[in-house]
Amino acid sequence: MGYNRTEIPLISAERSITMRVLDIDLDFFLADCCPLAELGHRPSLPGHEPWEASAVRAFLENQCGLSRTAPKPGRIFETHDQALTFWEEQIAAGRLTAPFDVTHVDAHSDLGIGYPGPNFVLFNVLSMPVPKRLDYAAFYAQKKLDEANYLLFALAMRRISSLDNVRNPRSRADIPQVLLDADGNIHLNSLTAQMFAAKNGAEPTVPFRVYDDYRDFRAAGAYDFVTFAISPRYAPKEADGLVEVVGEYIKKEKNFCNGC
């Protein structure tokens, strides 16, 4: 399926309203979370059946406020860390202002529960001046940034003003508690961060809300962008039919999704 480039209007310099991004993963729309498949392979279908298309549309329209007749600018991609690349491109183009609110609809938190864990960000990245943190290509080169921790990097880059995590009912506990303050909000903190606070400024507290039951979620307002990841190692190939369903709500710039 080919997606044509569309023009996304530039935001005005005077805009002060916090922008909002809806960030979805295909694995949210499964009966249960899949174990991570080997590179080049997909999880098996039994126990991980995809939702019916009608249920996906009901969630997107009734709870996220999306419409097929007025799709939002965005992108479909293979792995979820490409959301970070997309956001940085939109910021550079003057279409997205940071920090922005993120609604993360995903079976996983993507906050770094697996290797290399949160410590690289807490002790290495937080020692850097904020402009240097934005060099995400360097973190890719070091094999530290991936689809399981890109949101943690986005937080360290101070791109996110608030984060909602809408989870699959069968999601496993994967939110690193070290990232949370006493109120359950995200506050990246470490001895390293404290040592460099005079130079880098204090790390912001980011309001964080978790919806373990997605039925409790209702979008607080309209979204400016929608991104959607297929995450093939986390979803069986039988779920790929939902890519086109979700794609009806996204005004694609270009075909960034191989094989969609």
Regions of interest found by a model, annotated:
Residues 20-260:
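Conserved alpha-helical scaffold segments that buttress catalytic/binding sites
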Residues 3-18:
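Short, Lys/Arg-enriched N-terminal segments with co-localized hydrophobic residues
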